[in-house]
Amino acid sequence: MTYAIVPGDSLKAFMDRLDFAVQQYPNHIDFPQTENGAAEAFEPNVTGFFSAIDIRGARNVAFACRTFYSTGRAVPWMLSVLKPLKIYPSKFFADFAEWQLCNNCDYKSGFLPESQNHKDIEKMQLVFLDEKYEEKRCQDMIPLVNDIVKINGAMSRLVSDDEEAVIETSYNPDD
């Protein structure tokens, strides 16, 4: 998915495309403009519809999605976790982009999500989700959200990395 390439594109149109894409449960979403070496082939154009500030914002949102959703293997649980927050995926990724900037793991810092261990990305996801659920006054759901992320993360590492895991849940699984 690109931004500021096609004539008439805008930040709103990019965010709408991102929201639509996440609703389709894709295994990952590629953003060639955030990948090393590919940026020159997809140079964004400043227009009356897409300012330089909008382009930086779109790049940061794309990088946040790449980190949280694709590298973070959030496909199976993303929409379930967003529903109680009553927030669109694009807004969630925009907030995560701001969080990444504050935690020195954004696009400009040179952070490469694919070079990180999945457990490290999962820790980032859990910290950010805790903050979002507190912000939206949904603290009572934090243990459930943490369990969903941890269980799915452990299953994805078992399938992808052949890594077994013992996870601690907030409930007794035998009940």
Task: Please state what every model-predicted region is.
Residues M1-A94:
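A structural motif corresponding to the C-terminal lobe/cap of the Radical SAM core domain
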Residues N60-D175:
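Radical SAM enzyme core and accessory elements
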